[in-house]
UniProtKB/Swiss-Prot annotation:
Entry's Gene Ontology cellular component terms: cytoplasm; Holliday junction resolvase complex
Keyword Magnesium: yes
Family statement: Belongs to the RuvC family.
Job description of the protein: The RuvA-RuvB-RuvC complex processes Holliday junction (HJ) DNA during genetic recombination and DNA repair. Endonuclease that resolves HJ intermediates. Cleaves cruciform DNA by making single-stranded nicks across the HJ at symmetrical positions within the homologous arms, yielding a 5'-phosphate and a 3'-hydroxyl group; requires a central core of homology in the junction. The consensus cleavage sequence is 5'-(A/T)TT(C/G)-3'. Cleavage occurs on the 3'-side of the TT dinucleotide at the point of strand exchange.
Assembly mode: Homodimer which binds Holliday junction (HJ) DNA. The HJ becomes 2-fold symmetrical on binding to RuvC with unstacked arms; it has a different conformation from HJ DNA in complex with RuvA. In the full resolvosome a probable DNA-RuvA(4)-RuvB(12)-RuvC(2) complex forms which resolves the HJ.
Protein name per Swiss-Prot or TrEMBL: Crossover junction endodeoxyribonuclease RuvC
Annotated gene: ruvC
Reactions the enzyme catalyzes: Endonucleolytic cleavage at a junction such as a reciprocal single-stranded crossover between two homologous DNA duplexes (Holliday junction)
Cofactor field: Mg(2+)
GO annotation (BP), single: DNA repair
Amino acid sequence: MKIIGIDPGTAIVGVGVLEKKNGKLIVKNFQAITTPPIAKEKRLKIIFQKLNEILIQEKPEIVVVEELFFSKNVKTAISVGEARGVVLLASALNDIPVLELKPVEVKTIVTGYGHAPKSQVEYMIAKLLGLKTPPKPDDVADALAIAYAGFLKMGGLL
């Protein structure tokens, strides 16, 4: 089973690909989709095109993305929501189901504490996946954490 975790944003989208083979969880790929500081609709187009390429290449059984966390910064929440829409559209156009997880669920699964700081999530995901150091930027570590949490949520590692 192959799963892609996505941490959406308009400047950086973290992508993490995990695959279960012979009872082992393997990190297949991780990367950041970055966009230059241009008009938002052009950024979203770049995100869509690059994500669509990744979905076609990797052929995951499922995409996992965090539900929108509404913070005090409404502008940021709206931008993340727009990027999430691109993720959902790319997944739908490729007939890939989407699992949405709450940020607190991801943190609880990865660290054991739903309000863990970002640094703890990065540290734990590196340890859990056998990486020497946490992937950078942190959006990529978050994407791997989202994919890992998706596996556990679906019973993929049991």
